[in-house]
């Protein structure tokens, strides 16, 4: 998802590291991790975005997620 951001790479990487640490601490398998992260995204949209903008934000997030996934990347 390369685009200009108002957040530093360092800040983003630290948050990502912290979130991954929590998932690892709880030994969450991939399906549970995705379920929890999806619920977190839903909660953020429903509690922090105006109702009139929620669908547009969800669509934008979905497009960004899909564009960041490459089928040829090994896991």
Curated annotation (Swiss-Prot):
Q: Which Gene3D superfamilies match?
A: YejL-like
Q: Please give the Pfam families that the UniProt record associates with this protein.
A: DUF1414 (PF07208)
InterPro entries in UniProt: UPF0352, YejL_sf
> HAMAP family in the record, alphabetically?
UPF0352
Family in the record = Belongs to the UPF0352 family.
Q: What is this protein called?
A: UPF0352 protein YejL
Q: What is the lineage of its organism?
A: Bacteria, Pseudomonadati, Pseudomonadota, Gammaproteobacteria, Enterobacterales
Source gene? yejL
């Amino acid at each position: 998802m390369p685009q200009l951001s108002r957040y530093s790479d360092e800040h983003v990487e630290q948050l990502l590291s912290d979130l991954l640490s929590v998932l690892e601490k709880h030994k969450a398998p991939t399906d549970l991790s995705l379920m929890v992260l999806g619920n977190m995204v839903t909660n953020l949209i429903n509690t922090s975005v105006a109702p009139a903008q929620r669908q547009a934000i969800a669509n934008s997030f979905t497009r960004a997620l899909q564009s960041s996934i490459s089928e040829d990347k090994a896991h």
